[in-house]
């Protein structure tokens, strides 16, 4: 998710016109039609899109319901995703008490002074009246569970970690800078992300994960979860608009056979090492995305990154679309029990189909507007 997904500006002109036949075989693995400012326009654009699948992320508390409405109007194309983005988790209370803390109690504890943790941040007094009322994490997880159970094909997303984000100043504070100096503590982000991942594991749903300025924190979080025998290897995680280095990507792939990577030109394409990064990804783990909320631009954005992959990997259009089509299908599958999340080789898949005799494997995003 990025501030740019409100802007139709493209990072570079396409080298050739978008081919509707190819788009129909592709899935936009991560986009934000729920954030489109015009709901009816989003419905119209989703319906006219040539893409085969639009993976519609939720991000805030408010747009979980909008995601459902988009899916209800276009069930053949929209794949709904539910979750809370790290930009919107500061209202969640980790308290085990059944009573929701007051606004002052919650935010005073969440945003302490950098010089005296027993005191609130000096910036909090001005922002406090504009911050959303607290909500227990347990209550949000109940809503997340209900949404996923009501939509058996839904994914968990967008969730993750973001060490660049600062709480925006409200429009009422017009004389202030765009963003405050308040940052949701990493420990809070990790707790919320991990809680949502555990819901995904329990319900066997795949995850779309956001990571900005937090490559090693993300690696450590995923490694800790992988170390527990709770079914993590059954589900897949998509590291969306991946902005880490090629070296980090290789590290993640080695440690997490259930990890996929989706790329957008609007975010990933900013990196001077973008093509090197695309080449560092196992061909079986590549996905494409737009990360856009302007639904009229989804096709163009996905086509743009499709062309970049063709160029970086020296693939023909047909080879590229075949790989991406297969990868998306594999991403949506659950891994068999006991595989540890390892992708099956072509040989293993051929053997599974054969008769069996009887018995005797960093770019950052900016804050929202």
Model-derived segments and spans:
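An N-terminally biased module of ancient metal coordination in phosphate/nucleic-acid-related enzymes
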Residues: 1-82, 88-93, 97, 142-145, ...
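Short hydrophobic/aromatic-enriched beta-strand-loop microsegments
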Residues: 77-83, 236, 259-265, 340-341
């Amino acid at each position: 998710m990025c501030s740019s997904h409100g802007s139709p500006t493209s990072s570079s002109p396409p080298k050739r016109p978008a081919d509707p036949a190819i788009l129909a075989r592709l899935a936009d693995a991560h986009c934000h039609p729920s954030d489109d400012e015009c709901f009816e326009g989003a419905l119209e654009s989703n319906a006219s899109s040539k893409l085969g699948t639009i993976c519609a992320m939720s991000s805030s508390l408010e747009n979980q319901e909008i995601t459902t409405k988009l899916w209800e109007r276009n069930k053949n194309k929209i794949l709904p995703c539910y979750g809370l983005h790290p930009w919107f988790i500061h209202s969640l209370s980790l308290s085990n008490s059944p009573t929701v803390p007051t606004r002052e109690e919650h935010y005073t504890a969440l945003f302490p002074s950098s010089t005296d943790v027993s005191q609130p941040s000096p910036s909090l007094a001005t922002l406090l009246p504009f911050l959303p009322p607290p909500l227990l994490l347990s209550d949000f997880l109940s809503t997340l569970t209900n949404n996923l159970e009501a939509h058996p094909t839904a994914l968990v997303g967008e969730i993750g970690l973001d060490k660049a984000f600062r709480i925006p100043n409200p429009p009422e504070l017009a004389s202030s800078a765009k963003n405050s100096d308040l940052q949701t503590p990493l420990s809070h982000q990790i707790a919320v992300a991990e809680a949502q991942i555990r819901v995904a594991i329990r319900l066997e749903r795949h995850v779309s994960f956001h990571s900005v300025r937090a490559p090693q924190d993300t690696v450590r979080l995923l490694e800790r979860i992988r170390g527990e025998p709770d079914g993590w290897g059954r589900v897949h995680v998509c590291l969306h608009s991946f902005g880490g280095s090629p070296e980090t990507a290789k590290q993640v792939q080695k440690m997490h056979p259930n990890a996929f990577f989706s790329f957008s030109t609007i975010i990933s394409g900013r990196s001077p090492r973008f093509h090197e990064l695309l080449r560092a990804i196992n061909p079986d783990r590549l996905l494409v995305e737009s990360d856009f909320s302007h639904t009229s631009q989804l096709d163009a954005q996905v086509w743009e990154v499709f062309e970049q992959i063709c160029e970086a990997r020296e693939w023909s259009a047909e080879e590229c679309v075949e790989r991406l089509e297969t990868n998306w299908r594999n991403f949506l599958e659950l891994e068999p029990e006991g595989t540890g999340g390892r992708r099956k080789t072509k040989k293993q898949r051929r053997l599974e189909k054969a008769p069996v005799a009887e018995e005797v494997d960093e770019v950052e995003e900016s804050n929202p507007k």
